[in-house]
């Protein structure tokens, strides 16, 4: 029997009343367990196996699917559960984590980062910015290391910078002619991308960003992911469509 602290990142129906629950845990990394009877409303496993739930878990199992014996809810992130926009961002965070990681490869930092992101979304901080931070932090997990602290071509640390997927990072004005397809970004967007990639989440504080800046950030991050990650996430497509509708509604209300 093994014990762990984890976050439920995916759940699927299994048989009539059971669930297969995918968790990311502090001790073991990503694991899967069968939660017998968890679909029944009166089951002692019903609450602790809900998506996004952070809890303590006890299970039997080896390298394959384990069997969940009991669980205790630490945090259920109730605000996320009750808000469709928060839910969409949190779902994307969890799917990205699921697709980017292998079974039983512990990474306590990644566990803590995911918990902090979900907690901050739940507490009402900007979910789009938090998700963009998470996307940048997940790049090394995917084996991707864009050069963000200096020019990816000449190594200079000063000057004006654009973002180049071709050169795998930012490039300075001295090297602009070497990538005609580079992404020209406002200076503050380049700085934020660098901050998101390099600085710890707790050092970033509460970042207040204009909608236009967030759109630039998303364009750069999406372009990089599309070029290098090899991932297609349904939750990301839904999230981008939802963002478009939300922005249209905001513009209509402002007119």
Swiss-Prot record:
Taxonomic lineage of the native organism: Bacteria, Bacillati, Bacillota, Bacilli, Bacillales
Name of the coding gene: recO
Chain segments annotated as coiled-coil in the UniProt record: none
Family membership: Belongs to the RecO family.
Cellular component GO terms, alphabetical: bacterial nucleoid
UniProt protein name: DNA repair protein RecO
Entry's Gene Ontology BP terms: DNA recombination; double-strand break repair
Keyword Disulfide bond listed: no
Organism: Listeria innocua serovar 6a (strain ATCC BAA-680 / CLIP 11262)
A Pfam cross-reference name: RecO_C
Entry function: Involved in DNA repair and RecF pathway recombination.
HAMAP family: RecO (MF_00201)
InterPro entries the UniProt entry points to: ARFGAP/RecO (IPR037278), DNA_rep/recomb_RecO_N (IPR022572), NA-bd_OB-fold (IPR012340), RecO (IPR003717), RecO_C (IPR042242)
Alphabetical UniProt keywords: DNA damage, DNA recombination, DNA repair
């Amino acid at each position: 029997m093994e014990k762990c602290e984890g976050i439920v990142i995916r759940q699927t129906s299994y048989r009539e009343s059971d669930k297969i629950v995918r968790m990311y845990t502090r001790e073991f990394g990503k694991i899967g367990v069968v939660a017998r009877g968890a679909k029944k409303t009166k089951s002692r496993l019903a609450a602790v196996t809900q998506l996004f739930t952070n809890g303590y878990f006890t299970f039997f199992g080896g390298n394959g699917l384990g069997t969940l014996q009991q669980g205790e809810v630490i945090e259920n992130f109730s605000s996320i559960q009750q808000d469709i926009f928060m839910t969409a961002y949190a779902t994307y965070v969890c799917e990205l984590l699921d697709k980017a990681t292998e079974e039983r490869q512990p990474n306590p930092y990644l566990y803590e980062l995911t918990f902090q992101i979900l907690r901050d979304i739940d507490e009402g901080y900007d979910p789009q910015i938090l998700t963009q931070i998470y996307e940048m932090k997940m790049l090394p997990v995917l084996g991707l290391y864009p050069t963000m602290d200096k020019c990816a071509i000449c190594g200079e640390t000063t000057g004006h910078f654009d973002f180049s997927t071709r050169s795998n990072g930012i490039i300075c004005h001295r090297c602009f002619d070497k990538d005609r397809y580079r992404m020209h970004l406002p200076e503050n967007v380049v700085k934020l991308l660098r901050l998101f990639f390099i600085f710890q989440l707790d050092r970033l504080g509460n970042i207040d960003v204009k909608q236009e800046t967030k759109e630039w950030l998303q364009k750069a991050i999406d372009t990089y992911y599309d070029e290098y990650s090899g991932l297609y996430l349904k939750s990301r497509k839904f999230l981008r469509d939802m963002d478009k509708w939300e922005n249209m509604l905001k513009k209509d209300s402002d007119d």
